[in-house]
Amino acid sequence: MTTALQEQNTQSSATAGRVVRVIGPVVDVEFPRGGLPALYNALTVEVTLEAVAKTVTLEVAQHLGDNLVRAVSMAPTDGLVRGAAVTDTGKPISVPVGDVVKGHVFNALGDCLDQPGLGRDGEQWGIHREPPAFDQLEGKTEILETGIKVIDLLTPYVKGGKIGLFGGAGVGKTVLIQEMITRIAREFSGTSVFAGVGERTREGTDLFLEMEEMGVLQDTALVFGQMDEPPGVRMRVALSGLTMAEYFRDVQNQDVLLFIDNIFRFTQAGSEVSTLLGRMPSAVGYQPTLADEMGVLQERITSTKGKSITSLQAVYVPADDYTDPAPATTFAHLDATTELDRGIASKGIYPAVNPLTSTSRILEPSIVGERHYEVAQRVIGILQKNKELQDIIAILGMDELSEEDKITVQRARRIERFLGQNFFVAEKFTGLPGSYVPLADTIDAFERICNGEFDHYPEQAFNGLGGLDDVEAAYKKLTEKK
């Protein structure tokens, strides 16, 4: 279905205007009567600073009346002066799409950073697109097996769904995203798109080099809007990455994984732009259009007939406050939430997933099966009972518990440790090989632990391992030492 927005993407008119006002990254431009550019159109202006000429891209954000538009700059406006000539490109910001983007790093405007000029001669799509029509959506629900025990068992991911990684600073969100990129490339030979929203330059460089070293870069496109760039760039980079992913889904009929790190910085950039445009702030200082902006992004991330975009989004939680409007608005769109807990990380258990607060809408017998559901509920029940007993243990000690409660606590400790796992991307730090555990093995292992088959094994035998074979090997090593 052809929409007005898509028709606008292909327009090729070029209208000249002039700069009348510059306030930081916000630029007011006057156009001749009848030549007003459409909202979201890209404008270009030549800027000379210290004898160096460059082209700055602006995006139309508001129509002010009297042939004036207010635009947001996608680059620093140093050197931009009143009266400078501005050209309307007649279309939104466009990015290269297709196989050409794999293995390369782009900015929000679609410029290749590691190989300048790459992709500009090929097909390009505008970053503002309509979501798929209702009759094109896929109705079937399917599990995305990750090989990570705690996720597959307790918070299974939906193929074509949206998954949020929640947590404060330093609990492992980016590491888990890197691990998922590696697993998708290795196990499914799938295409991944990574959108770094407000990324630190160091983090982006490290990610690029690590992926190159691990041999998964050729199946991944990376798009960065770095922390030091204007808010307009950080607000649009997620849409640029999503547009590349949509091409793989809609044209090449591929299942794609879209990683967004960090969706909070997308909200934060929107808040900055909203303030610069003079909008009245809403709750906690966020933009009044927060829910709308989030919806525009999230509604495009979905499954269509036979192909999908599965999105994994890191969500920074300010001051670990889950009632903050930014994470709270994100919650509404997610199919699964994986909460990374500082308390679990402090025990040295990674991934530091909190199994009691993480959720998945597909953890239902009709979708995952009766046995999977029952084992998951037994594991959650044991961990919940252990949590309830912690106050008694802290005050009176383990000796005051009944025999049944003592067994529950001991099993919970084994389960908690066994939910940890070695990651492929962490091999160089831990010195231990990463592990992929099939879902069937995970269900079997936790069922046996819940049944008490390993009650005589010491807790150390379950530390951050893969499957039960690793537990047996660790137990054998421990008994030999004795």
Curated annotation (Swiss-Prot):
Membrane topology: Peripheral membrane protein
EC number(s) stated in the UniProt entry for this protein: 7.1.2.2
UniProtKB keywords: ATP synthesis, ATP-binding, Cell membrane, CF(1), Hydrogen ion transport, Ion transport, Membrane, Nucleotide-binding, Translocase, Transport
Residue ranges crossing the lipid bilayer per the database entry: none
InterPro entries: AAA+_ATPase, ATP-synt_VA_C, ATP_synth_F1_bsu, ATPase_a/bsu_AS, ATPase_alpha/beta_chains, ATPase_F1/V1/A1_a/bsu_N, ATPase_F1/V1/A1_a/bsu_N_sf, ATPase_F1/V1/A1_a/bsu_nucl-bd
Cross-referenced Pfam families: ATP-synt_ab, ATP-synt_ab_N, ATP-synt_VA_C
Function: Produces ATP from ADP in the presence of a proton gradient across the membrane. The catalytic sites are hosted primarily by the beta subunits.
Protein name: ATP synthase subunit beta
Organism of origin: Corynebacterium aurimucosum (strain ATCC 700975 / DSM 44827 / CIP 107346 / CN-1) (Corynebacterium nigricans)
Biological classification of the source: Bacteria, Bacillati, Actinomycetota, Actinomycetes, Mycobacteriales
